[in-house]
Amino acid sequence: MMRKTLVIMAAGIGSRFGQGIKQLAKVGTSGELIMDYSIRDAMEAGFNHVVFVIRRQLADEFKQIIGDRVAGIVDVDYAYQEISDVPEPYAERFAQRTKPWGTGQAILACRDLVDGPFLVINADDYYGREAYVKAADMLEKVSGKDKGLTVGMISFILGKTLSDNGSVTRGICALNPDGTLNSICETKNIVKTEEGAGVQTDEGIVPLDVNAPVSMNMWVFPQSFMGVLKERFDQFLSALDQEDLKSEYLLPILIGQMLEEGRVAVQVETSQDQWFGMTYQEDVPAVKEAIRGMVDAGIYPESLY
C-alpha cells in the first residue's frame, strides 16, 4: 500500500505572535493543538504517515507536547530544519545567518523521509476536513515524469482566511480557464473591511475581491519535486549576496517562478471551509471558540485521544 505522507512545517518562528511558540499553543477542548485536528482530518482522508519538520532544539518539548501521542495512532518521522543544511560551498559563506531559510528548505529537510507523493501544510493553520479529502485525491494526479512536473494546491476563499486582529499576507491566485494556476501574487497588509477585504496602503485601503482564491501553503507534490527543490535552492543561494541574512527560499515564490518559465503545471482545488490560524496572539481565543463550536456540533469529539 502506498504511503500517503503528511508533511507538517512546524519549524518557523512567528514574528508577530508574541510570547510562546504558536505551533504549540493549546486550543482544543482537551488541550489539543491545531496540529492534532489536522492529523485527525488527514487520517480520515487516508493519510498514514506524518513527518514533522521542526527545530532540533525543540525536539524534546515537541515530542512531549504532541509527537509521542501522535506516534500512538500513525507512523511518525522527524526532520530537522537547520540553517547549516545548505550545499557545501555555502556553509561558510552564510555562517552568520540566524534566520531560518524558509518553507522551501523546510521541505528539503525531509528529502530522505518521503518515498512517494506528499501533502505539505503549516503547523499552525486549521484547514478543515474538505481540504484533506481533496488533497488525498490529488496524490494520485501529481507527477514529475513524461510531460513535466505537475503539482497540486488546495486554495481557500480570501474572505475565509482573514484575522480580526491585524493585517495578513496571502498568496492571491489567478486561475486559468481550465482551473490550473496562472500566477500567485504574495500580497501583504490585507485587512478586513466593511465591504470584505482590502490592502492597507499609505493612501488608504485598496479593495480586494473577497472571493478570490488564495494559497495557504497547502501543497501536494510528487516525490520527484525534492530534486527540483534541491536544484533551485542551489540557484537561490548562488545568487544571494553574502551580506543578505534575511532572504528566504519560499514555496509560493518558487512555484510562481516556475509557472512563469513554463516548468510546472499546478492543479487547483478550492475548499469552501473556513480557514483559521494564529498570526497574532489575539487570534487564540477565536480559534478556541471555533473548535469549541465544532465539538458542540459533533464534528470532533471532546477529546481526540
Provide a role label for each language-model segment.
Residues 2-67, 74-76, 81, 116:
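N-terminal glycine-rich phosphate-binding loop and ensuing alpha1 helix
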Residues 129-219, 223:
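Conserved core of the sugar-phosphate nucleotidyltransferase
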